[in-house]
Amino acid sequence: MDEEILNIQVRKFLKKVGIQSQREIEQAVKNYINKGSLSGAEKLDASMLLEVPEIGLKVSIEGKIEIE
């Protein structure tokens, strides 16, 4: 196994996940603010499930997104 290649591939995947998930969250928040369902000052609970079935990896990452 080439650790440098693994590192590059993991970073590429995480970059894709980060960009796509940020877009999805921002769009959903804007939609809910426009509908009046959010005021724009909430703290939203967020979670992400990272799963790689071939190696038995399943990790839940939790946090809060503060909207100001």
Predicted feature locations:
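N-terminal intrinsically disordered, cationic/polar leader segments
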Residues: 2-11, 27-30, 37-68
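Long, contiguous binding/interaction regions
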Residues: 12, 17-20
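Alpha-helix boundary/capping and short turn/kink residues
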Residues: 19-22, 38
